[in-house]
């Protein structure tokens, strides 16, 4: 028999074969995960996700000569054709914006790293990530996942999908401020009052 993309297509027309492919994509959906929230699902019919015929199946079946159908009943031939899909990108953007992770009340802004005095010395307190989406970048991540037929995507795996802190723990100006603060704590000044001296240090 004739198999195309793992489907037994023996004695089927191109229209019938492509209908099988269409049915295969009818139930498509993608699960979207994000920082700190439960996953949500975007169904294929919400974005007009569908199989798009390229004409490859028809061309493949037309190339087979009538007598090869008889021969094909006794031996298996397997073929692979591309399965192109399409969807409405505007609707995908709308679905993204409707997700819980895109709602302001569910987002926390990132916090900058800063210098703090702890346990007798100055240290850098690292920035926090937050969960505020960068909608443009998040859409690109989601769009690429849908275009490649993935059934799940996690924005947390792509830091660029989120708004990042302006000042990170590796910021050069912050490192310099830390060094200056710790130099201050190590400095000492000695005052002389007649025969008495008093030393003041950063502590």
Model-derived regions: residue spans:
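Surface-exposed, secretory/extracytoplasmic low-complexity segments enriched in Ser/Thr/Asn/Gly/Pro
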Residues: 1-203
């Amino acid at each position: 028999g004739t198999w195309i993309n793992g489907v037994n297509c023996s004695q089927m027309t191109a229209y019938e074969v492509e209908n099988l492919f269409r049915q295969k994509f009818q139930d498509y959906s993608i699960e979207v995960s994000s920082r700190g929230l439960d996953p949500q699902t975007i169904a294929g019919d919400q974005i007009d996700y569908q199989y798009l015929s390229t004409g490859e199946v028809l061309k493949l079946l037309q190339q087979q000569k009538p007598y090869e159908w008889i021969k094909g009943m006794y031996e298996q031939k397997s073929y692979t054709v591309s399965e192109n899909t399409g969807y409405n990108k505007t609707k995908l953007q709308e679905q993204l914006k409707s997700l819980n992770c895109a709602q302001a009340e569910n987002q926390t802004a990132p916090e900058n790293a800063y210098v703090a005095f702890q346990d007798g010395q100055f240290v850098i307190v690292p920035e926090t990530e937050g969960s505020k989406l960068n909608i443009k970048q998040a859409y690109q991540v989601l769009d690429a996942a849908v275009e490649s037929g993935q059934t799940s995507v996690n924005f947390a795996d792509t830091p660029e999908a989120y708004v990042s802190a302006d000042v990170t723990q590796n910021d050069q100006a912050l490192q310099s401020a830390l060094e200056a603060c710790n130099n201050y704590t190590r400095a000492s000044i000695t005052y002389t009052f007649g025969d008495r001296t008093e030393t003041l240090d950063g502590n």
